Amino acid sequence: VTSPLLCVRDLKVVIGGRHILHGVDLDVAAGGVTALLGRNGAGKTTTVRGVLGLVPRTGSVRYGGDETVGMTTHQIVRRGIGYVPEDRGVFVALTVAENLRLAERDPDPAYDLVHELFPELKQRARQQAGTLSGGQQQMVAIGRTLLNRGNRLVIADEPTKGLAPRVVTEVAVALERAAQAVPVLLVEQNLALVRRLAAHCVVLADGRTAHAGPAAELLADTEKSKTLLGVGRRADVTARGGDH
């Protein structure tokens, strides 16, 4: 059996005396898309931040076989983790092209791929990122991640939140292409997107792991989906932007 690329065990986070995570277990396979699911407030974003060392944490976070608890965020990310945060993380004072160049990759076929996935970025190369729509900024954030040849894992935190349906579709295609090269940990509440992309899922509830298994099985199980995720019908609806 292939060992997971990312193996999280008993991850706990306490912030300001408040217990946010009570012991999360999470595996991300060495290929494909793993979805991290849960209702609002379940601890999904805090789990990602804990994995990246952005918040104080205890437990074990093994990445590529190495323990990363005790490392700084810079040390962790330098080991090959691409991060698309919920707030998109673009540099608003830089142009689109300058944001993409932060990936430190010389022009090569990867730029062609980004422009193929997001034609608007080529058209708006000289435009300041701060003047872009939220959807266009998300394209920049994902495009920058795709251009970083050092990434061995991509973590995307609710990448379709609040986006128009057309942009949701473009983001889905981009994540599919990314997953052909590196594993993806996808935090998402758009269950149609999860159904399309993810082979495996982990569900959090109240800061703990409540379920782990094949995504298709969970999303086809009406009762379990309703209990864990709060959906009252089969979770195979058409993807919509802002479906949160």
Predicted regions: what they are:
Residues T2-H244:
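Glycine-rich phosphate-binding loops of nucleotide-dependent enzymes
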